[in-house]
Amino acid sequence: MEIGHVYEMPPMRPDDAHTTYFPAGVIKIGVEFRDLTPEALVEYYGGDEDYVEELRRTAPLGIEDRGVSLHVFDADGHWEYLRFDLFEDAPHYHYNHLGGGRNHIIPFDETAHGPIADWAVAKIRSGELAPMLAQAGGAELAARLDPKALATAADDVAAHAADLQARLAASA
């Protein structure tokens, strides 16, 4: 059974000018603040109003939200395999399947799992990131994850994400 929603278009890449990257061995993790709006999606996807309308129609929790995103790339930054969106209204995560535009978005249940920020950092810190990477087509990376590098990166990612979230809360 597949949960969530699959879009056949690639996800929005992070804005490198506003993303801080933390190396973690064979992967790197980007931390970015995002303000997701229909207008931002239209601008990113070249004015494809049909795609934005599909998002409005099919996204169960809407597409206007903001918060911190954690981007999990291969170390060279060629492919974003996973993304954890620590959003205010509709936290969720993505499997961005290697080699295509398949973008699988899964709503996050904070009642069952606690705050998504804690859950996402725990996934990065632990071996539980490996099956998620494999699911997104990164089995080779998953097999080569370095637990020490992940632990160090997880601490840095958690601190930077908390700082961005605090700034977000202060601006509300």
Predicted regions and their residues:
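Charge-rich, low-complexity N-terminal segments
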Residues: 1-60
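Generic hydrophobic, helix-prone segments enriched in Leu/Val/Ile
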Residues: 29-31, 120-124, 157, 164
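Short, flexible loop/turn elements at secondary-structure junctions
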Residues: 33-35, 74, 88
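Conserved aromatic-histidine-acidic binding/catalytic patches
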Residues: 58-62, 112, 145
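Short, well-structured hydrophobic secondary-structure segments
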Residues: 59-83
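C-terminal charged interaction modules
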Residues: 129-172
